[in-house]
């Protein structure tokens, strides 16, 4: 399971020109699922995201988690995080889990974040989405569990 994490001052996701999820200050997280992932990875990722210390403290140092600053999280499913570009010019997607396996696991990540007290908005699974992000820092990290 992979997550591309961006610290944001705001983020939103739209489907067919309608905003389906938006957050203020916090994190925008793109989540990719691979074949061997399961509930344990989903829970571990939710815990790492909730505790990841990339939010600024009063001295401007990345020392606080999104939980500690009452931040919000936008979660967007992103199968392309498992794109393989080692051969040719067109990515291969064989490492990405199919939707029947991936969707419940993304939902488990969202549930795990909510269980940890976070406000979470989401995109729409399998939809063509437009994501608007105001990246702070910029601070962008890749997590893998």
Task: Identify the residue ranges that each predicted region occupies.
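C-terminal edge-of-domain segments
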Residues: 131-144
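Compact, glycine-rich, soluble single-domain proteins
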Residues: 18-70, 83-111, 115, 121
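GST superfamily/GST-like fold recognition
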Residues: 119, 126, 130-134
């Amino acid at each position: 399971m992979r997550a591309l994490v961006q610290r944001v001052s705001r983020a939103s996701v739209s489907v067919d020109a309608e905003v389906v999820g938006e957050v203020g200050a916090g994190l925008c997280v793109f989540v990719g699922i691979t074949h061997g992932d399961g509930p344990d990875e989903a829970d571990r990722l939710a815990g790492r995201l909730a505790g990841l210390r990339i939010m600024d403290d009063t001295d401007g140092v990345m020392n606080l988690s999104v939980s500690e600053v009452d931040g919000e999280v936008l979660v967007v499913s992103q199968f392309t995080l498992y794109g393989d570009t080692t051969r040719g010019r067109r990515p291969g997607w064989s490492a990405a889990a199919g939707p029947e396996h991936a969707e419940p696991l993304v939902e488990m990540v969202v549930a795990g974040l909510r269980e940890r007290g976070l406000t979470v908005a989401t995109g729409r699974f399998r939809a063509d989405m437009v994501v608007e992000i105001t990246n702070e820092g910029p601070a962008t990290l890749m997590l893998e569990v």
